[in-house]
Amino acid sequence: MDIFSEILPLREQIKAWKREGKRIAFVPTMGNLHEGHLTLIRTAREHADIVVASIFVNPMQFNNADDLTNYPRTLDEDVEKLTAENVDLVFTPTPEIMYPEGLEKQTTVDVPVISTILEGASRPGHFKGVSTVVNKLFNIVQPDVACFGEKDFQQLALIRQMVIDMALDVEIVGVPTVREMDGLAMSSRNNLLTLNERQRAPVLARTMRWISSQMRGGRNDYLSLIEDASDQLRAADLQPDEIFIRDARTLQEPTEETTQAIILMAAFLGQVRLIDNLVVELAAASNDEEE
């Protein structure tokens, strides 16, 4: 496996593969890899001849300096895992490589509307940081296809929209969330939980499934449903941060025409912010007039 931290040698290798007619898949990560990331890698392998991964903790997408400082960095272990998965190349740039003039002078990519609603409303600038770094990585790696986890549902929607708006020639593949045996969505942040917190963490997924069952049973008083779910989280000493019920296609409020909804949840467990989501199939709305 090739490991590059500089842009130029990476580009030369990519060009060589392209000349050979190779199809290239890309998996951008922030490191601290777990089974969820490795599932992205395996999915990428199914879509291409060459798999490229990146490991870069992107400072532009962090609102909280402590969160950036405390984010787990395990480069040696990550490289071992990627080697075991037969990844062809890993790109490990520093902030100085990605942002040579500093964040203040970096040209940014801002996807309107979707970057400022839901999680974007409470984390201003976060999604601009995501879209900027992903766009830059796409320009560096020039992939044919890129794989992203559905756990970060709004992020996936943002990237799909950016690809459309910027006319990028990249196929975006969403990969279902990978979960622990107890239902907790796999995340690098899970490593920051204490043993006691880890035991309580699955309450987030259980509460989400409870909301889903209520919705599939016909309950549509969403504000009351969200408050009931918040109470369940508080009872387990989780602090609700965000709970949204939206149309899965538009990320707007559900309407009578909504047939597929998405539950988006975030809660603090101690100092760790956990996120999760679940798609809910609703009874199809009928617009047919009675004969």
UniProtKB/Swiss-Prot annotation:
Keywords: ATP-binding, Cytoplasm, Ligase, Nucleotide-binding, Pantothenate biosynthesis. It catalyses: (R)-pantoate + beta-alanine + ATP = (R)-pantothenate + AMP + diphosphate + H(+). The active site is at H37 (proton donor). Pathway: Cofactor biosynthesis; (R)-pantothenate biosynthesis; (R)-pantothenate from (R)-pantoate and beta-alanine: step 1/1. It is found in: Cytoplasm. (R)-pantoate binds at Q61, Q155. GO terms for cellular component: cytosol. Catalyzes the condensation of pantoate with beta-alanine in an ATP-dependent reaction via a pantoyl-adenylate intermediate. Homodimer. This is Pantothenate synthetase. It comes from Aliivibrio fischeri (strain ATCC 700601 / ES114). The lineage of its organism: Bacteria, Pseudomonadati, Pseudomonadota, Gammaproteobacteria, Vibrionales. The gene is panC.
